[in-house]
Amino acid sequence: MTEPATTPTTPDEQIPRHRYNADLAGQIERAWQETWSDRGTFNVANPVGSLAPTDGSDVPADKMFVQDMFPYPSGDGLHVGHPLGYIATDVYARYYRMLGRNVLHALGFDAFGLPAEQYAVQTGTHPRTRTEANIVNFRRQLGRLGLGHDTRRSFSTTDVDYYKWTQWIFLQIYNAWFDRDQNKARRISELVEEFESGKRTLDDGRNWADLSKGERADVIDGYRLVYRADSMVNWCPGLGTVLANEEVTSEGRSDRGNFPVFRKRLRQWMMRITAYSDRLLEDLDVLDWPEKVKTMQRNWIGRSTGASVLFATAADDIEVFTTRPDTLFGATYLVLAPEHDLVDTLVTDAWPDGTDERWTYGAATPREAVAAYRTDIAAKSDLERQENKTKTGVFLGAYATNPADGKQVPIFIADYVLAGYGTGAIMAVPGGDQRDWDFAKEFGLPIIEVVTGGDISEAAYAGDGTMVNSGFLDGMDVASAKEAIIARLEADGRGKRRVEYKLRDWLFARQRYWGEPFPIVYDADGRAHPLPESALPVELPDVPDYSPVLFDPDDADSEPSPPLNKATEWVHVELDLGDGLQSYTRDTNVMPQWAGSSWYELRYTDPHNPDEMCAKENEAYWMGPRPDEHGPEDPGGVDLYVGGVEHAVLHLLYSRFWHKVLYDLGYVSSREPYRRLVNQGYIQAFAYTDSRGTYVPAAEVIERDGKFFWPGPDGEIEVNQEFGKIGKSLKNSVSPDEICDNYGADTLRVYEMSMGPLEASRPWATKDVVGAHRFLQRVWRVVIDETSGNVRVVEHEALSDETLRLLHRTIEGVREDYAALRNNTAAAKLIEYTNHLTKEGVAARAAIEPLVLMVAPLAPHLAEELWKRLGHDTSLAHGPFPEADPQYLVEDTIEFPVQVNGKVRGKIVVAADADKAALEAAALADEKVQAFLAGATPKKVIVVPGRLVNLVV
């Protein structure tokens, strides 16, 4: 809605000449931003390299590394929701800088990705042109906010000097394998040495020395942390690219563009993140992260303990994984994922006699039924398949043998079983699993009770109980039955104990243009070869156009063709990779957008290093473990990382994985990238929709008689009001430029920090911004005479006891609040103190200078200006920050509630050191208490020290 955004409310001639208003704020802010830039106020030194102290001095031991989740530079620029986290981290960094800490705070840009590429496709403009223009605008907008960044350390993931090291890290991971005995990554060269020495033998019994060069390469490729696999992927013909599971909506459509997505088997680059499942889980315990985020990661990794069980068939054994092997006697059918490798082998040519018609999918033969079913589910996402309440499936015409009792059970395919989880096959126990129960009811399959405690005629029962109908397990409890059946399966060679995970390996290729090229080439036989580090960076070539080949969105049979295929001269190269000059073909996929953000914290520590990702000394200084400060289990990492909870799983999981590989290989000393994480909330605002549910510009909506109207192109219409996250999609954005123009950046900073706790979402109301502005005007008036512009502070005015106590309580409280990111309560304390100074007319320097210093993290431009006018010739950016005098933190008096028979009837104020007798006397003397006593003498007086007095009548 349109709201007034101007500060003055009186005619210009009545406004004091030196009032703090938008114009003066703008002048002050521009001047101090220029001063900070010229002086390098926020530049911070490294132990070694180009950013080391030029005088040879050591860097301070007391450091602080603060980091924001860096922005994607969209063409729309910032809205007021974006700076929330940036301002909060700036307040935090400024506070610790004033305490004397060596603070690293910088901001780069996560600039690869689909939006810039789509714009390039539409306009023919190179994505870099659009991206760099967007970055210029972002830097301009962010610069207005007065963020204390070391701008020398800024970069974009699209900078060649940056993605050279993204490619380098890819090669380190590619040239590594995970040694399960040592529970860590090791270099491929060490694996080769073990095979050559005989220390390690091949699982299939072959002799390493007898293998050809190609066979050895195949063996090694099977160990690599980066590998190619024929895997089920999410193919989006409408975008011309493969999508990760996380980029597909629950409706089976692309998150961007809303195109249909199909499950398809393609050869793709994968990263073996699953090798780190246990370490990714275990190290969550040593991180100072929100429990919600830890839970999300634990659930995503999804560790479960159970058993693998082999069911014999006429073709081959079917391996299933189950967390409830105790229920094996209740398995009445098997279900395979429709994509399971054995489906085409097991399916029969004709239906067995007496096949239930419900099992046939309406087809004449099992093969026809399987083909039809696969076609019908091709567009479903994994999430949609698992959440689908209507159970569908097809009988393969084949049976398997239950190893527990030797009975034959039918084999089905169904979409609720996923190829990517476990073995892609389940033993269905309808008495113990609700999805199996629903399927059994739908298809008329037996339901057997194997654990007492439920009513399987009504629903499955998955709880504990006593085993029944389970042969030798009968009478056991569930835990004992699990151990007994696993022992039997292992003895019979039909199963074994096993741990399984929901986490899948990371699909690491995209059929796009605007991303990091792979440092991989293929020889004439199609074998992949990593490029030597000397060949980095592999730069993106220019292409005639930037779009992948797009297909009919519904064409599930289409095949991806990346846009880099069009750069034919770049694709075909002559290289000497150790066997003489040969012809090779470059990989034409690009890395996913997650790649650049999976390691950027490291580059902040050493952004100009041409020879290393980062020098070990710099990483160890900024990110190394500090057990003396953080405890013996400190994993190291960035001291504070702030960003949205929407990145709780993907970005944070991927960056943890990369960091752990680099740790294992000895490149970093920290075993985690981010020691502490805080998720900021969203800024929300009213949005408005027309009768069709289409959003209309909130700024154009008018409120009249409790209703809302929009003056659309066809005349005014009534619209509906709702509340949501501020942003482009809801058409309720407010630009920070607008607020800076009308009030100043310091006002925006104070307003956003005052709106509520950082972690909570909060409502935006432009009309309320003036409150923050008026607070800063009061701070200004405490120091500056608005009429003359002179400093009104006096040197030796004595402070009253009340002012002294409030001052030092404010100092103590603000210090605690800033350290805990409670900027809203810090602002409240500063407002209270400022109001006191104004009301009492306090002009003493001893009372006012601490206020200016305490305001500095929130409103740095104003504070710097006032500090200078108070006669200081150095910036306050590096302190000092006021310290509270303990003698003024002790209360002289304490208020106690007084109860009569357990109900509060009055309050007394007594000396802080009053004894029990004094408390009792004061309580009995209180007029309100006397009225309730009505002359009666209490039978008992109970004094709870520090809390209350209770009179029992």
UniProtKB/Swiss-Prot annotation:
Record SUPFAM superfamilies: Anticodon-binding domain of a subclass of class I aminoacyl-tRNA synthetases, Nucleotidylyl transferase, ValRS/IleRS/LeuRS editing domain
Gene Ontology CC entries for this record: cytosol
This enzyme's EC code(s): 6.1.1.4
Subcellular location(s) of the protein: Cytoplasm
Main subcellular location: cytoplasm
PANTHER family: LEUCINE--TRNA LIGASE, MITOCHONDRIAL, LEUCYL-TRNA SYNTHETASE
Protein name: Leucine--tRNA ligase
Naturally occurring in which organism (per UniProt): Mycolicibacterium smegmatis (strain ATCC 700084 / mc(2)155)
